[in-house]
Design a protein with these regions (language model features):
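Signature of extracytoplasmic/envelope-associated structural regions
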Residues: 1-213
Length: 213
């Protein structure tokens, strides 16, 4: 006997407020029925950790005034993660000399239309794919050997900053490409790409807030 878990996506609206300059009037764009279609977390040396969150909206409208009931009171004092806050792991082993580590989730999302509809009829989702890429200095052949031998790995990224810590873990990951690059007097580098597969009972990616170290 098996069971399935279904998570219903919540929709929301995004209001873009463009301030008028030199006497120009303000403009407002409201996008309704918004659903996130994935994300990409980029971690690189000498940079802040950044995230991209593409989305699809069911409809979009240009307004001449702020929608009734809109409020803009908010307080934001969180401190974003930087490259010095990031540690990458292969299982329990810390990965050394990593320059970049990017984790991408793609749900194969597309907007579907129907005859007679002036807006999106519904948002269709395909099978989610959690992929990654990392690059760094080649100081041994451990990761290259795992690519050549098609060894499954579990990669993690832990970010620990002043406001707390969180982790991204890719379960049952497989390297799909590994490229050593040799050129000039500089260090030999290794670029790796891969995808996490998970199992029918385990997600291919786990994102959580943690206590670290």
């Amino acid at each position: 006997m098996g069971s399935e878990m279904c998570i219903r996506d919540r929709t929301f609206s995004i209001l873009t407020w463009m301030k008028g300059r030199c006497g120009g009037a303000d403009s407002f764009i409201v996008t309704r029925g918004v659903e996130f279609s994935g994300f990409s977390i980029e971690q690189a040396v000498n940079a802040m950790v950044t995230g991209s969150f593409p989305f699809i909206g069911l409809s979009q409208e240009i307004l001449t005034a702020v929608p009734a009931g809109s409020t803009f009171n908010f307080s934001f004092d969180a401190q974003p993660f930087a490259s010095v806050d990031v540690t990458a792991f292969d299982g329990a082993a810390k990965l050394e000399l990593i320059d970049t580590f990017t984790i991408t989730n793609d749900n194969g999302t597309s907007a579907q239309f129907a005859l007679g509809d002036a807006s999106v009829a519904f948002v269709e989702r395909g099978r989610a794919a959690n992929t990654f890429s990392l690059a760094g200095k080649l100081y041994d052949t451990v990761l290259l050997d795992k690519f050549l031998n098609e060894t499954q790995v579990e990669l993690s990224s832990i970010m620990s900053g002043p406001s707390g810590a969180m982790s991204f873990t890719l379960k049952r990951a497989q390297f799909t490409a590994a490229t050593p690059e040799i050129g000039g007097p500089e260090s030999i580098t290794l670029s790796i790409e891969g995808q996490a597969t998970g199992t029918p009972l385990q997600s291919s990616i786990v994102i959580q807030r943690i206590a670290y170290p």
